Amino acid sequence: MLKKFLAKLGKGAAKVDLQFENRPYGINEVVQGEVILKGGQVDQQINKLAVKLMMTVSSKNGQSVSRQVDEIPLTGPFLISKQEERHIPFHYSIPSTLPLSRNFVSYYFDTHLDIEGGFDRTDIDHVIIAGSREIHSIFNAFSQLGFREKATSGKLDTYGQEFEFFPTQLFADQINELEIRFAYMGTGIKIWLEVDCRSNYGEIEAKREFVLSKELLENEDQLVDFLRDSIAETVQQPQLYGQPFSYHVQQPGHSGIGSGIGSMVGGLAVGILGAVLLDEIMDSFDMDEIFEDAEEAIDTDDDDSDFFGMDFDDFSGGDD
């Protein structure tokens, strides 16, 4: 009787442990593993066993919120005997429209063992969601062109996820910042490219969008050449590329996700968090950028020889 009473309080109760290979997982990739159940000091009735994928979005000011992305049911009701051990297979395919893990976007699996008449048991396991092989190829190509990802890259909005880069080599005297978005298309990867070009009259925003074919994505040298030529063409005549992006035209008022633009990376975020909550969290980034831009302008006026007018410690990215 005492053991049953203690088990209801959690002492000597059944335990749960999700195990899978600890590495980054690309979108559309399958996480495979198993859940190990170990019976406690007494027989216990289990109502269900399920694993939830949770997403946490944080802001610079420390505000954060976690929401359920998906739930993977593993069992219905069953009885686990005293000291019994069970191994239950687990697999989950990462959705293509999830935001990628970045400084302010993270994920974890919450394994939940629902014990009848007692304290439920949980197991938390963090997981990194990375880009697909094709997106890795694009990131690597930008890296070869001297672009480094900013610390605030990966911000979310009601369309999806935006990745921000700054130049360190080839285009350092022509570009302030480069921003990109991705979407999976049947023929390859669609990319939206916004280039903040330097000019004698201030900054000019140029917008380009094109589809990188599967064949191009498989050839690293050709991909680098294509992106280099596209960026060079853009900075030479930025005034020719002032039209709004197609997803702005197709989705007036930011009212929907995925209409006519394929599967934009990060597009699932607004459905998980809600547009209002997402906007509130991301507002802190917008204010930080306003102050950073003001500081950059002041520093540039004080010292024209210092191109960026900012501390590179504010950024993080790939290896130089």
Predicted regions and their residues:
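N-terminal leader-region detector that preferentially activates on the first domain or presequence
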Residues: 1-99, 103, 108-263, 279-320
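Hydrophobic alpha-helical membrane-embedded or membrane-associated segments
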Residues: 263, 267, 271-278
